[in-house]
């Protein structure tokens, strides 16, 4: 199972939209159960430290094995990103 890390700002509408689209994609049979989603709030010390360790300074961002998806993307782009991650095995 791949670890997909979500860095977000909980009070931000952009982060909420990004997270909603990501969860919608992860619910598809193609991706269901294939990712372990870890959430880091960038308002916390732990979240900021984790983000810095992988070179991320903005939110919302999804990160997995060196691949980064930044900002609000279409459902298609999110699915394309997840397929790319699964193809890396």
What would you call each of these model-derived segments?
Residues 1-31:
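Local sequence-structure signature of Cys/Sec-based thiol-disulfide redox active-site neighborhoods
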Residues 7-9, 31-47:
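Thiol-based oxidoreductase modules, predominantly thioredoxin-like and allied folds used
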Residues 13, 46, 76:
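Short alpha-helical
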Residues 17-20, 49, 73:
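Generic recognition of short, well-ordered alpha-helical segments
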Residues 21-23, 27-28, 56, 75, ...:
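Cysteine-centric redox/oxidoreductase cores and disulfide-bonded domains
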Residues 52-64:
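Structural micro-motif
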Residues 63-89:
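Non-catalytic, surface beta->alpha helical segment in thiol-disulfide oxidoreductase systems
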């Amino acid at each position: 199972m791949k670890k997909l890390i979500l860095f977000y700002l909980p009070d931000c509408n952009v982060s909420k939209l990004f997270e909603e689209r990501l969860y919608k994609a992860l619910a598809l049979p193609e991706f269901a159960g294939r990712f372990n989603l870890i959430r880091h709030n960038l308002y916390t010390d732990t979240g900021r430290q984790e983000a810095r360790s992988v070179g991320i300074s903005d939110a919302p961002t999804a990160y997995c094995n060196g691949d980064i998806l930044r900002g609000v993307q279409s459902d298609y782009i999110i699915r394309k990103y997840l397929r790319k991650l699964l193809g890396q095995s």
